[in-house]
Amino acid sequence: MAKKILVVDDSALMRRVICDIIDSDERFQVADRVTNGLEAFELLSKNQYDAVVLDVNMPIMNGLQLLEELRKNKITAKVLMASTDTKEGAKITLDALELGALDFIHKPDSAMDCRVDSFKERFLSTLYVVANSKPAMFSIASRVQENSRTAESMVDLVKKNPRKVTGSKIVAIASSTGGPKALQAVIPRLPASLDAPVLLVQHMPPGFTSSFAERLNDLSQLKVKEAREGEELQNGTVYVSMGGMHMNVKNTAGKYTIHYSDEPAREGVKPCANYMYESLIDSHFDEVVCVVMTGMGADGTAGIRNLEARKKVYVIAQDQESCVVYGMPKNVINAGLSDRVVPLDQLAQEIALSVGVKA
């Protein structure tokens, strides 16, 4: 049965083009189309849709205001945000993801550009993921905020529950759909004294990862930044891969630095976590702590398998219940690569216990 889609856009031309694209795919059916957030709210209050395609800038009630109203009234909806490719657009998109949107796509400025095959393919594949995802994680997020230990108490926890942490370690995290919100329940809980650098590949297009890293940095005690070419890795710092490039780690005279490559997308994504994991094969870290979080597809599995063949790894996968999309962790688990499977609210603790903190 075709998935029922609600389209919310104030532009009659753009609305028609988006609806035509959706209806061209037998997996979907445009059930309703409206011009602003208020009309959408009225429909969502009484109808169920498999996904909502939501514009940002609209009269009467814009996209963010609709998400706020849905959250306030505890109305669940699986929202795909149509964003603009600007610095301000990136900020608004991150706000939307915090408010419960599951994913976003850059909407071209003109309706003509929307008809290009590359956009249509990307839009329909993203819509399929959203339509088959769980609704926004309001309850999970609130539970994490209420029950999570602070970064300071995490240090005490690690010291009171020491594991045999020896040698140098590095943490490498992969996440996709649902990741931006889930990562806000993980990274801010890691202590600044974490005794390892952290690499992070979140599937995002160019122009969004810088704002995403800044937002995580504002919430965290340890430093979070978009990784720059040639930058040397430091313990207690999270390096977020740039969008649209593959992040690798190079060993130069005993120093580990960030290196980007512009190879084609792999697993349908760019950046791809497989490149990150495989770049650590020839490193001298005594152990690589691999963390695979919510997301569609199998990114991370091949890279971790290749890494495990050459190095000691410890693989942590997010559990099914707390994932928005149980794809990437499921593939790692089914491949027999996972050492621990834990819910979202235990990931930070598991990472900290695995690598330790500086004395």
Where is each model-derived feature located?
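Conserved acid/base catalytic micro-environments in cytosolic active-site loops
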Residues: 2-6, 12-27, 33, 38-39, ...
